[in-house]
């Protein structure tokens, strides 16, 4: 959409200005507060590789093994399950199994608004005893999310119904969403995300950094955003650890202890 086109232009302009002045982008945005940005593992259900028959992630045991593999390789201490694939009862069992396998670590669940309202209530109440970072878009729309707030005692997050300032104002009035997931493309660039984070801090909402399926260039925008936000309270999302290569020079950026150094 048009906002995402603005983001691409902003990224390029910030890069040009930084190169001209000889400074990193985070210096143009107020200066970094952290050298590394922590990330959560992103757990997807998967088909098996048709060539090898390996890599399937469908069962509880397969998902736990996949989560352990990612933790061992990258050092993640927060874990996100992308749901909305199987019946809620199966995904609930999978989610609880990962939490049990990663004691004391953060958990988050995102079914992309696929749950019915009743299923969202049941799922949310069934995981209240876990260490949940947040419950992301279990139902779709500000009004349903606000209704869910009355039944679930977990922070509710979104990257779908609060992605511009008009929606942010509506959320300020309804208090449907606790955690606004800032996406550098959805919001039209890094600077709008910083402005939105300031509004959220003023109004008592929390923020995190969202992933929309990035390569290295957009990942760099996420890292510079994460570096400068004083009210960043959660590990960022990223699809990045699922990539086998990247378009940037030197290959993919590396995780160290579940985090990536700000370039």
What is the predicted role of each segment?
Residues 125, 131, 140-157, 162-261:
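Shared catalytic-loop signature of beta/alpha-barrel
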Residues 66, 111-113, 133-138, 217:
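Short low-complexity stretches enriched in small and charged residues
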Residues 1-107, 112-121, 125-129, 246-263:
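N-terminal capping/lid subdomain adjacent to the active-site entrance of alpha/beta enzymes
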Residues 40-42, 80-82, 108-112, 136-138, ...:
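A cross-family glycoside hydrolase active-site/sugar-binding cleft signature
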């Amino acid at each position: 959409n048009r906002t995402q086109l603005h983001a691409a232009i902003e990224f390029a302009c910030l890069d040009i200005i930084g190169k001209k002045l000889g400074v990193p982008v985070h210096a143009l945005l107020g200066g970094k507060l952290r050298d590394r940005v922590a990330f959560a593992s992103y757990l997807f259900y998967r088909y098996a590789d048709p060539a090898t028959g390996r890599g399937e992630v469908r069962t509880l045991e397969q998902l736990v093994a996949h989560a352990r593999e990612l933790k061992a390789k990258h050092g993640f201490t927060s874990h996100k399950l992308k749901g909305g694939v199987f019946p809620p009862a199966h995904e609930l069992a999978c989610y609880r199994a990962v939490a049990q396998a990663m004691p004391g670590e953060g958990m988050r669940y995102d079914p992309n608004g696929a749950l019915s309202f009743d299923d969202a209530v049941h799922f949310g109440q069934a995981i209240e005893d876990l260490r949940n970072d947040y419950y992301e878009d279990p139902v779709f729309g500000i009004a349903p999310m606000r209704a869910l707030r009355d039944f679930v005692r977990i922070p509710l997050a979104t990257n779908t119904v609060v992605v511009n300032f008009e929606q942010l104002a509506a959320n300020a009035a309804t208090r449907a969403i606790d955690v606004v997931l800032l996406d550098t493309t959805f919001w039209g660039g890094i600077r709008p995300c910083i402005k939105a984070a300031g509004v959220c801090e003023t109004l008592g909402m929390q923020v995190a950094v969202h992933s929309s399926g990035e390569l290295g260039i957009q990942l760099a925008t996420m890292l510079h955003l994460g570096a400068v936000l004083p009210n960043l309270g959660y590990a960022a999302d990223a699809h990045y650890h699922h990539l086998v290569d990247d378009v940037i020079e030197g290959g993919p950026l590396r995780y160290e202890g579940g985090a990536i150094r700000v370039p």
